[in-house]
């Protein structure tokens, strides 16, 4: 199915209040002014992602939300762990992995192409494809920026390329990091 339209602010408020209660229950000290500002921004922005998804992808169905990846890695005894914010499937049979990011104004070209930022999606794609036995050519990755302080265009979705070479580089970097931790 599709994401519901019209009740996003209510859903956000309920979820936000539950998270705040959990933090308070855990003994976290919160600054009320920041909590209030954050809630106001969230209510304001809550209804914007669904229309942005429809505009960007046209017809789509939600394949999964907050999908847990806990997948074996090749050549090491570790598991890859991650949570994919949203996966939609479009009429052409492609899967689109979407990672939501909040920001004040957006990202510049350097940030959009920074391997340390984009490798997250590359690794999600690799492990999602293996988990579901899907050809990686049928999976695309995207960042969706929710811009809190923008005057217009509060949601920006853009594709991040992640072919075989980039996947190889991301896996190599991850394995090197794991080796250095041992």
Predicted regions: what they are:
Residues 1, 48-51, 96, 123-130, ...:
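Residue-level signal for well-ordered alpha-helical scaffold segments within enzymatic catalytic domains
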Residues 1-68, 72:
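A non-catalytic, helix-rich entry segment at domain boundaries
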Residues 17-20, 25, 97, 103-106, ...:
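Short amphipathic alpha-helical segments and their helix-coil junctions
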Residues 33, 52-55, 74-75, 108-112, ...:
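Short helix-to-loop capping/linker segments positioned immediately adjacent to catalytic or ligand/cofactor-binding
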Residues 37, 116-119, 123, 169-176:
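Generic recognition of stable, solvent-exposed alpha-helical segments in well-folded globular domains
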Residues 61, 93, 137-139:
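Residue-level signal for beta-strand positions within conserved beta-sheet cores that form or flank
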Residues 64-122, 128-129:
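Non-catalytic protein-protein interaction segments used by genome-maintenance enzymes to assemble
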Residues 126-182:
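Metal-dependent nuclease catalytic regions and adjoining charged, substrate-binding loops involved
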């Amino acid at each position: 199915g599709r994401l519901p339209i019209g009740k996003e602010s209510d859903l956000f408020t309920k979820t936000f209040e539950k998270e705040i209660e959990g933090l308070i229950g855990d003994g976290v000290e919160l600054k009320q002014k920041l909590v209030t500002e954050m809630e106001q921004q969230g209510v304001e922005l809550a209804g914007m992602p669904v229309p942005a998804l429809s505009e960007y992808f046209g017809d789509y169905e939600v394949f999964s939300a907050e999908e847990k990846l806990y997948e074996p890695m090749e050549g090491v005894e570790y598991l890859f762990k991650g949570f994919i914010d949203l996966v939609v499937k479009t009429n052409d049979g492609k899967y689109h992995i979407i990672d939501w990011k909040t920001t004040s104004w957006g990202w510049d070209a350097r940030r959009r192409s920074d391997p340390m930022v984009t490798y997250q999606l590359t690794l999600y794609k690799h492990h999602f494809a293996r988990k579901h036995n899907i050809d990686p050519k049928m999976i695309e990755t995207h960042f969706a920026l929710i811009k809190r302080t923008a005057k217009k265009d509060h949601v920006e979705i853009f594709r991040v390329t992640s072919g075989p070479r980039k996947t190889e580089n991301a896996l190599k970097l991850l394995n090197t990091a794991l080796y250095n931790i041992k």
